[in-house]
Regions:
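Mobile active-site "lid"/loop adjacent to the S-adenosyl-L-methionine
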Residues: 49-78
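Residues at alpha-helix caps and immediate loop-helix transition turns in enzyme cores, especially N-
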Residues: 44, 64, 71, 102-103
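Flexible loop/turn segments at secondary-structure boundaries
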Residues: 10-12, 38-40, 59-61, 97-100, ...
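Conserved SAM-binding motif I beta-strand of class I
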Residues: 1-6
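S-adenosyl-L-methionine
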Residues: 8-52, 58
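Helix-to-beta-strand junctions that scaffold the AdoMet/dcAdoMet cofactor pocket
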Residues: 83-85
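C-terminal catalytic and target-recognition region of SAM-dependent MTase-like enzymes
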Residues: 47, 74, 88-150
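Amphipathic, non-transmembrane alpha-helical secondary structure
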Residues: 37-41, 73, 77-80
Length: 150
């Protein structure tokens, strides 16, 4: 079963349309228009085998960086705690001012907070169609981690 969670009703309508277009069994999919962190608070631990955490940009300027890193930590701690042993978390950031290193540290802190053993299986970067101009390194804003949760 797939649960799709987003605070945007428009996004959830598009998800539902794509489920229909793809010919997927609608009984095996639930769309929930709710804040992801609020949703995760009520989900039983070990519910999911796989979770994709892909929030909107939490920091659009340097002044928002510390709050963004705390938000990434809270969201990832909630996600890691809801994944069953042997499960996976794909987690992403599209915040330009959040470096790969700072994002990874927020995720590491989240894992430590949960007390779960977590391994990085892969570091994910933006694809080649999001080329980075050498004179604008901040253009390398998409980053992610594939985590294995023991």
């Amino acid at each position: 079963h797939v649960d799709s969670v987003d605070s945007s009703a428009k996004a959830m309508a598009l998800v539902d349309k794509n489920v229909e277009i793809g010919g997927f069994d609608k009984s095996r999919h639930t769309s929930l228009c709710v804040d992801a962190l609020d949703y995760l608070r009520d989900v039983p631990e070990d519910k999911y085998d796989l979770m994709i955490v892909d929030p909107p940009a939490f920091a659009k300027h340097r002044g928002a960086l510390n709050n963004a890193l705390r938000a990434y930590q809270r969201l990832n701690a909630a996600a890691i705690s809801k994944v069953a042993p042997g499960g996976f978390v794909f987690t992403f950031s599209c915040s330009q001012v959040v470096t790969k290193e700072a994002f990874a540290l927020a995720v590491f802190s989240a894992a430590a907070q949960t007390g779960r053993k977590v391994r990085i299986l892969d570091r994910l970067n933006q694809p080649s169609d999001h080329a980075v101009n050498i004179y604008h390194p901040e253009g390398e804003y998409l980053k992610g981690l594939l985590l294995y949760v023991e």
